[in-house]
């Protein structure tokens, strides 16, 4: 599994020329191609590929696209994990594991606390939003994504405090 390889080899993954990085990219592309081929119109399963992207895209915009996409999505992944924990979908050990893996790869796991209102406004314009409900891809367990329509902005804000710096 991709996550296990990342967890076991952070020093090799930090070297973009390593064979492990090539292997991970090939694995990720195969997974993405499989998901896309099952849902060409992004009306169902393909939505899982947006894991970490709702907040990640808002961070990219807030930073005027000066952040790398992967760094912004990494923060979004931690936020999605924290949302899943708050909703009772995910165990705290998986949230901690997610943070640890991303940190070991020198990726950010938090973002500025003073940008919340701007991020929320941007997320409301996200293609995945449905009316006043923001939709996030979260995990119920490793390898088992689901859509979470967050019922209340207070949940979003309280969860953001878990990643705010």
Where are the predicted features?
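Carboxylate- and glycine-rich phosphate/diphosphate-binding segment that chelates Mg2+/Mn2+
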Residues: 1-49
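C-terminal charged capping/lid subdomain of soluble metabolic enzymes
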Residues: 2, 89-165
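Short alpha-helical scaffolding segments that buttress acidic/His motifs in well-ordered protein cores
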Residues: 24-32, 77, 102, 123
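Short glycine/threonine-rich catalytic loop with a Thr-x-Gly-x-Asp
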Residues: 45-51, 67-73
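Active-site His/Glu-centered metal-binding helix of metallohydrolases
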Residues: 51, 55-59
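Residue-level signal for inorganic ion chemistry
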Residues: 53, 77, 142
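Catalytic Zn2+-binding segment of zinc metalloproteases
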Residues: 58-67
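An active-site-proximal "capping" alpha-helix that borders the catalytic cofactor pocket
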Residues: 70-85, 97
């Amino acid at each position: 599994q991709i996550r296990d390889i990342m967890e076991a080899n952070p020093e090799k993954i930090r070297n973009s020329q390593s064979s492990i990085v090539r292997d991970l990219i090939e694995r990720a592309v195969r997974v993405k191609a499989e998901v896309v081929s099952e849902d060409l119109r992004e009306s169902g399963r393909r939505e899982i590929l947006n894991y970490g992207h709702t907040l990640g895209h808002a961070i990219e915009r807030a930073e005027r696209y000066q952040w790398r996409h992967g760094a912004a999505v990494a923060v979004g992944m931690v936020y999605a994990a924290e949302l899943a924990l708050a909703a009772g979908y995910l165990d705290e050990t998986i949230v901690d594991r997610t943070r640890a893996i991303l940190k070991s790869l020198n990726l950010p796991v938090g973002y500025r606390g003073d940008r919340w209102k701007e991020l929320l406004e941007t997320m409301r314009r996200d293609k995945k939003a449905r009316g006043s409900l923001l939709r996030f891809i979260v995990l119920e367990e490793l390898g088992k994504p689901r859509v979470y329509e967050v019922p209340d902005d207070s949940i979003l804000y309280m969860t953001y405090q878990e990643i705010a710096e």
